[in-house]
């Protein structure tokens, strides 16, 4: 978590002799702390890109409070021009090899248990596998019988309609009456065939 600023040149110049902060009559302790912070190089500052001149937020707050108490026309945001928040590098602790190995072992165990759970119902017993072909044959015969029954039903209803239509010409002279009579007879025959077909299918399903 950030707790300090990387001071810019504006703040450094303001604290130098003759700078903007000199006429603000800073308390001796606050000035000494700011000078110590701005004059001290942070660890790793020998590097050209390394951080230096770190000022804590506490010192910035004290400086801001002093400027407000004096009703100064020098504003803090002007002094902090060019400054940046300093985020220290977070060093990750090394991982425990024993803990890593234990976690990998747990992952493998969980994966094996999940695989066994998924494939538990896939394997079949020898007796069940042996009866697959016979069961398939029964299903094929049942489907074939159902198709033949439906075909016979359609043919029977159509034949009843045609016969009634042709035979009713000796009774009715109007075509509408002949068609109506043929529909009535075909419906009765269809219902009878449907009843017989349903009973037959119930018997076959009961055997299965």
Swiss-Prot record:
Q: Where in the cell is it found?
A: Cytoplasmic vesicle, COPI-coated vesicle membrane; Endoplasmic reticulum-Golgi intermediate compartment membrane; Endoplasmic reticulum membrane
Listed under GO cellular component are: COPI-coated vesicle membrane; endomembrane system; endoplasmic reticulum; endoplasmic reticulum membrane; endoplasmic reticulum-Golgi intermediate compartment membrane; lysosome; vacuolar proton-transporting V-type ATPase complex
Which cysteine pairs make disulfide bonds?
none
What membrane topology term does the record carry? Multi-pass membrane protein
- Supply the Pfam families for this chain: Vma12 (PF11712)
InterPro entries listed in its UniProt record:
ATPase_Vma12
Query: What are the transmembrane regions?
Result: 146-166, 179-199
Q: Which domain of life is it from?
A: Eukaryota
- Give me any GO biological process, just one: vacuolar proton-transporting V-type ATPase complex assembly
- UniProt KW keywords: Acetylation, Cytoplasmic vesicle, Endoplasmic reticulum, Membrane, Transmembrane, Transmembrane helix
PTM annotation (N-acetylalanine): residues: 2
Q: Which GO terms describe its molecular function?
A: oxysterol binding
- PANTHER family in the record, alphabetically? TRANSMEMBRANE PROTEIN 199 (PTHR31394:SF1)
Role of this protein: Accessory component of the proton-transporting vacuolar (V)-ATPase protein pump involved in intracellular iron homeostasis. In aerobic conditions, required for intracellular iron homeostasis, thus triggering the activity of Fe(2+) prolyl hydroxylase (PHD) enzymes, and leading to HIF1A hydroxylation and subsequent proteasomal degradation. Necessary for endolysosomal acidification and lysosomal degradation. May be involved in Golgi homeostasis. Binds 20(S)-hydroxycholesterol (20(S)-OHC).
**What is the protein's quaternary organization?**
Accessory component of the multisubunit proton-transporting vacuolar (V)-ATPase protein pump.
Q: What is this protein called?
A: Vacuolar ATPase assembly protein VMA12
Q: Which organism is it from?
A: Rattus norvegicus
């Amino acid at each position: 978590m950030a707790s300090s600023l990387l001071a810019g040149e504006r703040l450094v110049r303001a604290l130098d002799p003759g700078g903007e902060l000199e006429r603000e009559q800073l308390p001796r302790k606050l000035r000494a702390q700011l000078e110590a912070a701005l004059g001290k190089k942070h660890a790793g500052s020998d590097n050209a890109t390394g951080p230096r001149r770190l000022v804590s937020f506490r010192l910035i707050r004290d400086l801001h409070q002093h400027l407000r108490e004096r009703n100064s026309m020098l504003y803090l945001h002007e002094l902090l021009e060019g400054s940046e928040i300093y985020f220290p590098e977070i060093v990750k602790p090394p991982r425990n090899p024993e803990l890593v190995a234990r976690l990998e072992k747990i992952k493998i165990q969980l994966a094996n248990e999940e695989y066994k759970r998924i494939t538990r119902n896939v394997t079949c017993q020898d007796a069940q596998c042996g009866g697959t072909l016979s069961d398939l044959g029964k299903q094929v015969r049942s489907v074939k019988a159902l198709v033949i029954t439906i075909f016979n039903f359609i043919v029977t209803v159509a034949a009843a309609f045609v016969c009634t239509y042709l035979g009713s010409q000796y009774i009715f002279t109007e075509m509408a009456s002949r068609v109506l009579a043929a529909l009535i007879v075909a419906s009765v025959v269809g219902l009878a065939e449907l009843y017989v077909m349903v009973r037959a299918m119930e018997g076959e399903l009961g055997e299965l």
